[in-house]
């Protein structure tokens, strides 16, 4: 068992840019693990939600030593099905995912004074407690919590790409299906928000 943090999260250095680094980083991680003296050279992956997404992207990289994946409760199209639904920005999901799951670690890493950190922390707490007032903030690009590009800078980048374009194409798993030959056990839930991508 080898836990790995994606770039810019937890113990890994760098900047987190959801999905965009996981293809190359997934390839490198799988092949590194396969070369270790304690490894038999056969690598498998498992995980839920974003960790499922990293598996699909590693499989799309065609890492030769990736033998199987077990993605659970994750999407396969990170434009339509994760960030947007039918062209509509998934505001409530993106606010909570960006702020609660990712924002607190971003804020902890940032070099900010207490005066600068205070309003951002209050904004994260507000989204975590009752995110509905934030969903009514217009324009959605200017939600105060994301104003300084310290917390989840990708949030604004996603809004800058409201249609499927060159930003989304390299990370669309559905388009990569013909080149994925890694066996996969795909687990979903009927009431999971990513069920379309699972099916």
What are these regions (language model features)?
Residues 36-54:
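Alpha/beta-hydrolase fold nucleophile elbow
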Residues 8, 50, 76-77:
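Residue-level marker for beta-strand->alpha-helix junctions and adjacent short loops that shape enzyme
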Residues 27, 56-60, 199:
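Short, hydrophobic alpha-helix immediately C-terminal to the catalytic nucleophile
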Residues 193-199:
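Conserved alpha/beta-hydrolase "acid-adjacent" motif
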Residues 180, 186-188:
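Short beta-strand/loop motif that positions the catalytic acidic residue
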Residues 45-47, 72, 187:
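Short beta-strand immediately N-terminal to the catalytic nucleophile in serine-hydrolase-like folds
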Residues 1-35, 81-85, 89-91:
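Cap/lid segment of the alpha/beta-hydrolase catalytic domain
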Residues 60-62, 68-179:
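Accessory cap/linker subdomain of secreted extracellular hydrolases
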């Amino acid at each position: 068992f080898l836990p790995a943090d994606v770039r810019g999260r937890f113990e890994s250095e760098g900047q987190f840019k959801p999905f965009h680094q996981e293809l190359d980083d997934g390839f490198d991680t799988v092949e590194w693990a396969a070369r270790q003296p304690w490894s038999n050279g056969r690598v498998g992956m498992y995980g839920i939600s974003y960790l499922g997404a990293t598996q699909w992207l590693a499989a799309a990289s065609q890492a030769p030593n990736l033998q199987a994946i077990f993605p659970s409760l994750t999407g396969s199209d990170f434009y339509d099905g994760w960030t947007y639904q039918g062209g509509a920005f998934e505001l409530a999901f993106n606010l909570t995912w960006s702020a609660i799951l990712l924002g607190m670690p971003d804020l902890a890493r940032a070099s900010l004074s207490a005066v600068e950190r205070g309003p951002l922390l209050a904004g994260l707490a507000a989204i975590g407690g009752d995110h509905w007032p934030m969903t009514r903030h217009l324009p959605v690009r200017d939600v105060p919590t994301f104003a300084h590009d310290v917390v989840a800078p990708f949030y604004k980048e996603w809004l800058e790409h409201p249609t499927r374009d060159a930003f989304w194409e390299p990370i669309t798993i559905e388009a990569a299906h013909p080149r994925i030959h890694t066996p996969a056990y795909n687990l979903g839930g009927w009431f999971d928000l990513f069920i379309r991508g699972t099916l």
